[in-house]
Amino acid sequence: MLNKFILFGLALSFIYGSDNAEKDNLPKAITFAGVNFSLIENGNSAVHYIWLHGDEKTAKMAFDHHISHFPGKAFFIQNDDREVPYLQTRVDPNRIFSRRGSYYALKKFKPYWPPGTLKKALDEIDKDRIQFLEIIMPNKDGVLISVHNNFRGYNVKYELKYSRKTSIKKQQNPRDFILCTREKDFEKLANGPYNVVLQDTVSERDDGSLSWESLRQNVRYVNIEARLGYLTKQKKMLAFVSETLN
């Protein structure tokens, strides 16, 4: 009888221990450069999504809708503006995925830094970046999909000179396009109705964006760019990418 109680106790310990171990593996808080990110998971998938600019509300709404219909992990920045507060300045979170990009991002709104303080800030961002990328990057079979909106005239034509292959559709608005970093993904996406560009070589113009960091890490990356306010269009583009690459 005693042996039965011992075995039962060991079984309970194993069950609760396993649950606690799984909880311990989850990040207590997801932060990067002092700003928080929320995480929404739907099922078990190697597809990761990220929304980086808080002022691009159409992209967020498209994301909210998409993650409820498609499996994956979606990371949402908890901020309402394009830039996020950092130390005594503001930085664009999509310009600090390299040390070079971080340098220019930090100096954009604060040109002068007391001796030693800029290096310290860069070192802190470097440390934060390593931890953040470990969380958001998918495994080797996965893909990282970001969503952005444009409202200042930015369009696919700005990306042509940095792209090795392009598929431009005359019937499509140039401000709506897909950027990818794998040739196989490009070939699949180019068969669809949307503008698509392939950037699979790291450029000297490294601006600190997530696309270049993904390329350096050999991670499949896709950016879905759409005009601010064109929610239906961005929903369709997201669905097309997910259905085409999975």
List PLM regions with ranges.
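Sec-dependent N-terminal signal peptides
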Residues: 4-13
